Structure formats: C-alpha cells, structure tokens
Amino acid sequence: MPFPDNLRRHRLGQFLSQAELARRSDLHTLTISRLETGRAKPSSRSVRALADALGITPGELATPEEVAEADKGALPIQRRTRDRAIS
C-alpha cells in the first residue's frame, strides 16, 4: 500500500485526528496533511516519528525504497514548538 494511504489508514484506525498525530509525533499538522495527500514524501526521520506515535514499526508505514527516495531530495520537515512551527 502506498505510504500516504498507509499513514491515513493507521491514523484513522486509532481514531486520531491529524492534529493529534502531529502532537504525538512532534511534527506540524501541515506536514501530516501533506504526507497523507502525497504532496510530501516521507523522510526516514518523519517515518520514525510517526511510527513511534502510532505504536508501530517504521516498516509498517513505509518501504525502504519510499524513504530512500524521499531522503535524497527531502526538504526539512517542520517540527512543532510550543507556539509555532520551525524548520
């Protein structure tokens, strides 16, 4: 299953909103949205953060090929601070 669909399936399977998954993974809500719609590719760092937040292994979210492709040209992911996102 492609990463965007897989991420959404796992998130919804745990009845989490994008905002709650963002909070748990320390990623920005916009990053979650972009990953789920395929407008952003997952980096190895974001896959690990999301897997930890969902209580699954990184391999359950993304294939090594998906991560390697994204890591080649990945932009920095947006991390949350208490009040604002930073790069």
Predicted ranges, named:
Residues 12, 26, 37-39, 66:
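Residue-level detection of the helix-turn-helix DNA-binding "recognition helix"
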Residues 52, 62-87:
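Short, charged recognition helix plus adjacent turn
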Residues 12, 23, 52:
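Alpha-helical residues within the helix-turn-helix
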Residues 1-13:
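A short, Lys/Arg-rich alpha-helix, primarily the initiator
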Residues 15-34:
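Short alpha-helical DNA-recognition segment
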Residues 26, 43-60:
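DNA major-groove recognition helix of helix-turn-helix/homeodomain DNA-binding modules
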